[in-house]
């Protein structure tokens, strides 16, 4: 196979584009896809300070590098979730990447800062770990961005991630979630603008980008993610994509272009009646935000924190 652009030998084929690329042209393709996502959805404005949530994985580290290559003022944020050796190794990859490039990395440890970690939070909430993890990350990410004066919070959600989430929301007709499922969530009082610049790149493309640009990342999946239904949705979409390349992109982009607005009012309604949390000040529809309620439940657990994190 030849590179679509320069006709040199291709190192990767991107089936949904029906194209192969050499290493140099492929990395340029990745930059162009991110640039297009940013421009099409007005994600980042001139002079914006961007905080990139990094986990040590391919998507977030790749995103940080791509934003820097495109000239954006982007710093990193790593949140230690207390998931045993997995969190320890993830932090090592994030720190090594930041040190290699001499880029600022803000670090927040969930246990040290808030008194609990994901394993204890999951047990306290009596839910699957991903629920406690997602709630905690959303709160800490936004708080870090707002507190430290960043205009934009960027996350490494890619095309595969967003298509799987969309499938789950459609299967359950989650109107509020469908109204918020967009590459950009605008800034609001107490909220930084949230953007997903990788929405035009799939997991396989990002893995290839990291290999070709020598980004060292943690390969292992989170050990607490077993049973996450979105992994099942991803597998379903992968099977469809194998038979019909481009289906995931058509599904997601079709919704963004033609379906998202139909649910926009449901999302707006959920943000109209927000007030400051009585404990942390974060916007919430009730007196106490969900994160602070989780924190209170976790504090009531009697199991030693570090022991549970390492279990």
Regions found by a protein language model. Name each.
Residues 1-5, 9, 304-311:
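Short, low-complexity, intrinsically disordered N-terminal peptides in bacterial proteins
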Residues 2-180, 184, 188-191, 200-213, ...:
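ATP-dependent adenylation/nucleotidyltransferase module used to activate substrates
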Residues 31, 39, 45, 49, ...:
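Flexible helical/loop "lid" subdomain adjacent to adenine-nucleotide binding pockets
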